[in-house]
C-alpha cells in the first residue's frame, strides 16, 4: 500500500471519515481533526511508518490537509 492510501486509511480508522475526496480540505475546519485527534494521528503515523514526528515540525498549517500529511510522512521517511 502506498503512503497516500495508508494515510487515508489511518484517518478513516481513527476518525470514521473518508477523506479520499477532500485531500486538500483543511481537516481542522472540516471537523475531522482537533487537538486530541492530532495526537492520536501522530502516534499512529509514527507506528505505521516507523517515523518520528518532532513536535517542533508539526505545525497545524503544515499538516492540516490529507495531502500535506502525505507529504510530511514522505519527507520523514526519506530523511
Swiss-Prot record:
Residues 1-77 form the Carrier domain. It comes from the Bacteria. GO terms for biological process: cell wall organization; lipoteichoic acid biosynthetic process. It holds the Pfam family PP-binding. The modification O-(pantetheine 4'-phosphoryl)serine is found at residue 35. Transmembrane segments: none annotated. It is found in: Cytoplasm. Gene3D superfamilies: ACP-like. 4'-phosphopantetheine is transferred from CoA to a specific serine of apo-DCP. Its main location: cytoplasm. GO terms for cellular component: cytoplasm. The keyword Cell wall biogenesis/degradation applies. Keywords: Cell wall biogenesis/degradation, Cytoplasm, Phosphopantetheine, Phosphoprotein. Pathway: Cell wall biogenesis; lipoteichoic acid biosynthesis. PROSITE patterns: CARRIER (PS50075). GO terms for molecular function: D-alanyl carrier activity. Carrier protein involved in the D-alanylation of lipoteichoic acid (LTA). The loading of thioester-linked D-alanine onto DltC is catalyzed by D-alanine--D-alanyl carrier protein ligase DltA. The DltC-carried D-alanyl group is further transferred to cell membrane phosphatidylglycerol (PG) by forming an ester bond, probably catalyzed by DltD. D-alanylation of LTA plays an important role in modulating the properties of the cell wall in Gram-positive bacteria, influencing the net charge of the cell wall. NCBIfam families: dltC (TIGR01688), PRK05087.1 (NF003464). Belongs to the DltC family. This is D-alanyl carrier protein. It comes from Streptococcus sanguinis (strain SK36). The lineage of its organism: Bacteria, Bacillati, Bacillota, Bacilli, Lactobacillales.
